[in-house]
């Protein structure tokens, strides 16, 4: 019990140091890590955020459309869209002056998440639903075959798997917290 209380107090202290954690409802503190995956999760790791992105790739641009499709609370949707805009994943564009309304479009940074979402969908189809039972599958328009994403080396074109890679750590990179603080400061 004492260990639980100590861990809880440490988390509360780290949330005080990094208010973004409390805002995002995080239960773990990745802010001191130097990790691209942890940093990415801070931007797009929330389930609502991933579903917002999924729908953006399907052409949804307006707040009301997301709310209707997802059934998400207005305050949650507004917070997720604000985070995506602050991180440059989406851009808010005014489409009506009276009443003032805006729509949200993917930036290049947001469009660069396409392979991530396609890979997640493929993984879910194969490992959650089971092969051949997925909710949605993608067909390559050019060849007409069902699409399954694979990673390839940009330099040589070889299809790769995790075991084909060597991890190189950059010791002088910023922590996740430093990166988040810089983005949130710049977006104010």
Predicted regions and their residues:
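Short aromatic/hydrophobic contact patches that present stacked aromatics
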Residues: 69, 103-105, 137-139
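Alpha-helical linker/hinge and terminal dimerization helices associated
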Residues: 87, 116-127
């Amino acid at each position: 019990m004492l260990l639980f209380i100590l861990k809880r107090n440490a988390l509360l202290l780290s949330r005080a140091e990094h208010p973004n954690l409390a805002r995002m409802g995080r239960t773990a503190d990745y802010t001191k890590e130097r990790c691209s995956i942890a940093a990415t999760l801070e931007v797009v790791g929330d389930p609502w955020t991933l579903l917002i992105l999924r729908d953006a790739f399907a052409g949804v641009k307006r707040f009301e459309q997301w709310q209707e499709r997802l059934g998400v609370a207005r305050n949650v949707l507004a917070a997720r869209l604000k985070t995506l805009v602050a991180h440059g994943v989406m851009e808010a564009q005014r489409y009506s002056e009276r009443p003032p309304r805006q729509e949200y479009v993917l930036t290049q940074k947001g469009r660069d998440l396409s392979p991530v979402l396609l890979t997640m969908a493929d993984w879910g189809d194969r490992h959650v639903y089971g092969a051949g039972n997925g909710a949605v599958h993608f067909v390559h328009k050019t060849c007409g075959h069902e699409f399954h994403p694979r990673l390839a080396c940009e330099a040589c074109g070889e299809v790769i798997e995790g075991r084909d890679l060597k991890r190189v750590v950059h010791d002088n990179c910023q922590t996740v917290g430093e990166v988040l603080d810089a983005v949130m400061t710049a977006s104010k």
